[in-house]
């Protein structure tokens, strides 16, 4: 009976690890594809914040936001639902990496709500200025998040996964 429980636990850990590996690959791929869109969003937000009456700049800001919003929504959901809970469940995973990821995620969500609350097309000049400024801050924060993920969080997750898989065979 105890052996069956251990086998079930090992299988459960393998399934969780496989989900995390898949999520990590997807997140890394999304990070690499976001570069140009982040730059476009930062520029479009800054420009429309300075010239909110320009309808072409409003359309460009809306297009820039709409190009990154769905990717970021999936990205943040994947981190929240799969990656961060898994990392939190590990005893030796650095808590500062988890805390930093959670803080950056929260900041992105707050900035995203500001941008989402306004229509770049129909909003007042004041609203568009606020949303444009938030869009630029969002893009900068997103760039910081991607940098931290690629430099710190993802390599640590890979080491933890590698340690799990090599430890499972011992």
Where do the protein language model's features map onto the residues?
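Small-residue-biased structural context
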Residues: 1-170
């Amino acid at each position: 009976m105890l052996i069956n429980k251990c086998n079930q636990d090992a299988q459960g850990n393998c399934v969780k690890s496989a989900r995390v590996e898949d999520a990590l690959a997807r997140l890394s791929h999304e990070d690499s594809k976001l570069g140009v869109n982040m730059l476009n969003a930062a520029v479009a937000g800054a420009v429309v914040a300075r010239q909110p009456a320009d309808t072409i700049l409003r359309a460009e800001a809306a297009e820039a936001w709409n190009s990154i919003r769905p990717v970021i929504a999936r990205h943040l959901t994947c981190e929240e639902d799969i990656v961060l809970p898994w990392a939190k469940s590990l005893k030796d995973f650095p808590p500062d990496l988890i805390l930093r990821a959670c803080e950056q995620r929260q900041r992105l969500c707050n900035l995203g709500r500001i941008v989402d609350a306004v229509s770049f097309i129909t909003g007042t000049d004041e609203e568009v200025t606020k949303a444009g400024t938030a869009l630029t801050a969002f893009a900068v924060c997103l760039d910081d998040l991607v940098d931290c993920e690629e430099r710190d969080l993802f390599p640590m997750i890979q080491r933890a996964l590698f340690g799990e898989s090599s430890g499972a065979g011992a």
